[in-house]
């Protein structure tokens, strides 16, 4: 009742979806529309179906299935009386060109998890190896259709993915293999049964049967008694302890076929022979004691004849093989007695001949069991005849042409499920031999040397018959026989008895998924602009000079989190996790994989750094920068879709600081880790040195901005480097595992590093010195809003206009109010100050204001009580002369005077004196960066934490209005 209710609901929903579509829907579009309308997938499992096509085939009163010329399936609704009016309205709708193009595009690239192979009118063919696997699986026992995939996976270790071969459903697969598989309907469901034995086996059994039936009625009495006693008579061990009891078990294929195909004839002939067996003398046979019980058990069940004969060292003189028995049974009695009379000495090479024949028979059976078993006997004989016509061998590339010239037909290797002629020839190892040409560019085909096998077989029969005919002879052989042993011969590497596909798969032992990442490198993040402020998380700290940072933003940290969530959802599936297991022969240094440590729920991208032993290896986390030792069994192949996000960890270093000793102390490293733990910091990019990012770090979560490098110096854990410490940065050892970003690196500024004294003096010689005078009145400090540590401290989508913040391409000269201020500024300029940036850059904003993430709210101008008076023309001329005199003094003073600059420009605010305390023994932490001027006419707005960093570095100050 429940299934009927679900079926009625599904039929109603499917009908409504198909009626609403004028041009019909494909199967994928129907599944997508059903999921969008209902909110869940089509309940196939609840209704007992494996695919949507099977469900639609059982709804002929709802769905019409149309097959297009390109092989695609189009679905339309069956209109009834209740829905006829709606269908008429839908058919009257006007088609839109955009809708048609959209539908056509969907048909070309359907949105489905499996990209099915698009085929035309040619029906797909199941590969011969897969067909052989199905025949092998069903030969054990019949299987239900619902249990086929599970049984296939448990036996062969891989899933039965029929969609890879062009099939849309299991129904099409069963139709293509109807020659070997039969479907029977039972109460439990569809039962897959292997069809009866093939024509080759049947013909072999018939030949054996005819050889028995063609004998005269009076002849087989004596010969048949011998054959019957060999099968069913209890064995009596011979009292000769000096002879070893080494035995060999032989199962001739001919007799096995005979016993399995004609059990009734065996039983009837056995009963007839057994009635006359008492008239014959007892035949002594030496067998092992362990095998005598099996012969007795076989005697109790006459319907199942014995398939095995046990031979020992006395086999040459006291036993008889099946081949000799069949040969003797086809002879008259006179010939058999003549063979007994013509007894000869036993030969020690008989056992070697039996071993070789057994080995050849096993190889032939294995070749028949593989993909070559699907080739018919007629095709085998034709191929063999074509190859035998060329005594010097036939090139495998010329086989299709020679076959067509002989038979008038094309070589049907594709119809049999073989991908190439080489694969077909590889499956026919029982009739063909392959040899490489002298050049090694092609293969030559030779027919199997059956003549030699027949001669060897007949010679072995003659020697065996002559030795076995002396059963009742009293002569003893003085020559000792060698015990039977196992001979291991070196097999030629070019010889392959099975199909070529199995030879390729045997080297890897596991199927590597097609979307697994192999021999690829992860991309780095694109380089960040000089003087750009970013939010960072500090990861994997070794010292203040060696650590990793991870950028925060929608394109960096958020994408990484989304990718890790997808990896967790994907690899948590047991089937997916088992399929992507990395074998030991696929693990190599520098390759990227997926990893999950037991006890952790997240999957990470890792790169193998070194292999310690057979179980442990060192891996590098490209997204976090740390190195860990893990087990090989924890690795999984990384899917190719997880390579889009670049490596997030950026090797970094603090500039202009070094350790107080030869190496960084443990206390300094511990303190630096405490400052960086669990806090998003604001970083100001200085430059790149050997792929290492030199960056300033500032903690803006407290009331005052804290520069980490200055704090370490103040606490005595580090010292200021007088030279450029960034030049001494060592190259990161893990960067060769990554490849540069495909995006073009952002343009570096013209002043990517701290300007030297010589460069500053050159700039001062070519540019006019521009003095910026700041009002003596203490400027109003802007309100610095607090922000929580768990939120972003910037907005990447904020766009500013070029004119925001009073940016101007021409330098502005503030007017001088009084002579007192002018003298004061002139006095400060004469004081030497090192590492001062160019005064021309101080008044010019070369970069857009949005790089500093500062938002300024425009407001109406407020009238200032103390307006700056306009200077006269004489004052401007006096200012220009004073500027020219200042420049001349700097040129005469050399390197010390070339660094003169407005000290008040950097130390304007008297409240923030943290950096000023270190100015005697160091320089400004943000030397070389641009300064921003905020016009006094604008009311101060709520500046973000990034603006606070600029304010603490004296890059943001109030400028006087110029009228």
UniProtKB/Swiss-Prot annotation:
Residues 873-887 have a biased composition (Basic and acidic residues). Residues 751-763 have a biased composition (Low complexity). GO terms for cellular component: chromatoid body; pi-body. Residues 257-276 have a biased composition (Polar residues). It comes from the Eukaryota. Residues 232-306, 739-763, 803-822, 864-891 are annotated as: Disordered. Keywords: Cytoplasm, Developmental protein, Differentiation, Repeat, Spermatogenesis. Residues 586-645 form the Tudor domain. Disulfide bonds: none annotated. The keyword Cytoplasm applies. GO terms for biological process: P granule organization; spermatid development; transposable element silencing by piRNA-mediated DNA methylation. It is found in: Cytoplasm. Required during spermiogenesis to participate in the repression transposable elements and prevent their mobilization, which is essential for the germline integrity. Probably acts via the piRNA metabolic process, which mediates the repression of transposable elements during meiosis by forming complexes composed of piRNAs and Piwi proteins and govern the methylation and subsequent repression of transposons. PANTHER family: TUDOR DOMAIN CONTAINING PROTEIN (PTHR22948), TUDOR DOMAIN-CONTAINING PROTEIN 5 (PTHR22948:SF19). Belongs to the TDRD5 family. This is Tudor domain-containing protein 5.
